[in-house]
């Protein structure tokens, strides 16, 4: 499965807040880290950041936790 920047993907990590949600691949790290794929979502999660009204809308995943949407 070749995932590249800009692809729409569905999250398949069951313990993730974003499980079964669709997001857009923002970047892919090739240095060999465990979760190299950064996925950006339209909505924000439940983590509020001090001084902002929203939460976080990106998360890192392994390629094996993603499927094309």
UniProtKB/Swiss-Prot annotation:
Concerning Pfam families, the annotation shows: PSI_PsaE
Gene3D superfamilies associated with the record: 2.30.30.50
Q: What is the stated purpose of this protein?
A: Stabilizes the interaction between PsaC and the PSI core, assists the docking of the ferredoxin to PSI and interacts with ferredoxin-NADP oxidoreductase.
Q: Which domain of life is it from?
A: Bacteria
UniProt key word Ribonucleoprotein: no
Q: Which GO terms describe its biological process?
A: photosynthesis
* Primary localization class, coarse: membrane
Q: Which gene encodes it?
A: psaE
User: Which InterPro entries does the annotation name?
Assistant: Elect_transpt_acc-like_dom_sf, PSI_PsaE
Q: What name does this protein carry?
A: Photosystem I reaction center subunit IV
Q: Work out whether the entry's keyword set contains Membrane.
A: yes
Signal peptide (residue range): none
Q: Which UniProt keywords apply?
A: Membrane, Photosynthesis, Photosystem I, Thylakoid
Query: Where, per UniProt, does this protein localize?
Result: Cellular thylakoid membrane
PANTHER family assigned to the protein according to its UniProt record, in alphabetical order: PHOTOSYSTEM I REACTION CENTER SUBUNIT IV A, CHLOROPLASTIC-RELATED (PTHR34549), PHOTOSYSTEM I SUBUNIT IV (PTHR34549:SF2)
Membrane-topology descriptor? Peripheral membrane protein
Please give the GO cellular component terms listed in this UniProt entry: photosystem I reaction center; plasma membrane-derived thylakoid membrane
Q: Which family does it belong to?
A: Belongs to the PsaE family.
Recall the taxonomic lineage recorded for the source organism: Bacteria, Bacillati, Cyanobacteriota, Cyanophyceae, Synechococcales
SUPFAM superfamilies, per the entry: Electron transport accessory proteins
């Amino acid at each position: 499965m070749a995932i590249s920047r800009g692809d729409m993907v569905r999250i398949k990590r069951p313990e993730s807040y974003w499980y079964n949600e669709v997001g857009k691949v923002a970047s892919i790290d090739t240095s060999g880290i465990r979760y190299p794929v950064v996925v950006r979502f339209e909505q924000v999660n439940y983590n509020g950041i001090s001084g902002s009204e929203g939460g976080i809308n990106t998360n890192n995943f392994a390629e094996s936790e993603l499927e094309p949407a």
